[in-house]
Amino acid sequence: MSESTSKLDVNEVVKDQTEFMSSELPTPRYAWVALFATWLISIAIPMAWFALPGVASRLIPWMVASWVIPGQMTLDPGAAFGFLMNAIAWTAIIVAIPTGWIIRRIGPKPTLIISGIITAVGMAGVALFFNVSYETFLAFRVITGIGVGMCSVTGPTAVSLWFSNKHRFMAVAIWSTWVPVGMLFINNVSPALTSFMAGVDDLAGFLMNPANMAVATSQFQTVWWLITAIIVVALIVFIVLYRLPSIEKGEVSEISIERLDYKSAFPFLKNRQVVGLLIAWMLFEFVNFAFTTYDEAFLTAQFPEMWVGIEWMPAFLMTCGNACGILAPIGGWISDKLPWTKKWIIIFVGCFCLLLAVVFGWKVGAFYFFGFYLLFHIVGNVLLVGSVRPMVPFLVGRGGQTAVAVGLSILTVFQFGGECLETFVSYAIGAFASMDASAIGHVAVPPEAFQMTTWAVMLPIIAIGTAFALLTRPSKAEREAAKSPAPAPDWQPGEIDVPVDGTEVAEAPVQADEVIVEEEVDADDAPASRS
């Protein structure tokens, strides 16, 4: 497509969009090696994120004995633990956008290496200095959050560059299991490594003994040093195995590996489908995080007689619902099999399943209703985790590596933004529930009513998300263009295309002399072709 073209007919743009999305190049064999290396470091990093829940039943009493009783900490221990976990999400939101810029400057491999190093430093800092003070503990959790946030953007970018449209959804969906796999692994390993606490009824009293305190400290450190070691090993594997596709070897996908001006990505993001995808994903994260927060207590309150003697069962059932992101490759595989004009259906169905999950889970009157709730929760997770993140490079990939990185960085902001929004709402509901009856002007309301309020809030939230999922459907012009046989394509694989902006197409966002290369290249010597 000529760089001198300032305005193009919208039909020409739709045709190029159709050519990009309908292209099915063969995927290079080494792409699967690159995916493995990226996935390995990516599942190691969330282990640092979830380094605390597996030891929470021991860590919180330790915090009480070490900081609350001596008067060194005035925060409620449960709230203090929550801040340690939420620090990751808040930090990830802050670093997501700069990460897109960093990828544009140095590329995905160096950026992911930096992410791994920062996470390892944060985790090692926790292991070494967590007992100094709560503020020190929190500071190293923030450092860990920087690494997690960078990985959430860089990992799928590194994978997307290797895979063609034919396999990209499943490949990115495989990468998207990074959090469920890392979370499940460390949440099962941590209790085993801290099993010395088994059979101790009074944990706080146990920890009042200085000798026992030292034992507890060493056990926490064992878990956290293990996580640090796993990150380091995975990082070495990534450094050795991952590389960018080589055009000389014929390793070409539809997405160009050129790193362009940061602003060149923005026209590709001003797109109805992208906006619908972002909002639907944020509201899905809101509801899913609410499930994680409230489900166990809700289930126990609804059916207390069912869990006598099997207190672990509610938590196990909730784990099944929230860890089912491991099955995300199924959603990616289904998306790969669908025509490009039908891929949006997976996102819509996923949101609709979450809507049904809320309906069945809201004040259920029989346990079989919970079965339906759990089913729709799992199906919704599988479909959305397996399709939303891969959809970003599919929608903005014509802008090359830079557009993909920026798009995924914005998706990360919306993802963690949904979780933080849920935290605000839950705090607001909890504060309202804790008010004195005289302060709210009516008779005392049982706590279960406020628990139901949480579920009532989720219903309109996911309904709105389902409506926005409809916006990911291709336009009528694109659907019509996909039906008609096209002549020889103007767009070529790996080419940076001209962005769509309403009914007109603005001037191409970059010129040849704006392409970032490893060595200094004069503008007059820059190649005319972008492939």
Model-flagged regions — what are they?
Residues 52-57, 271-322, 326-329, 422-423:
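Extracytoplasmic gate region of multi-pass secondary transporters
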Residues 8-14, 200-209, 241-263, 478-490:
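Flexible cytoplasmic inter-helical loops of multi-pass small-molecule transporters
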Residues 105-116, 336-350:
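Cytoplasmic membrane-interface "Motif A"-like loop-to-helix N-cap segments
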Residues 396-435:
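A late C-terminal transmembrane helix in Major Facilitator Superfamily
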Residues 94-108, 328-340:
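Helix-to-loop junctions at the C-terminal end of transmembrane segments
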Residues 140-178:
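Cytoplasmic helix-loop-helix junction between adjacent transmembrane helices
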Residues 165, 174-243:
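Helix-loop-helix hairpin linking two adjacent transmembrane segments in secondary transporters
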Residues 341-388:
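C-terminal transmembrane helical hairpin of 12-TM major facilitator-type secondary transporters
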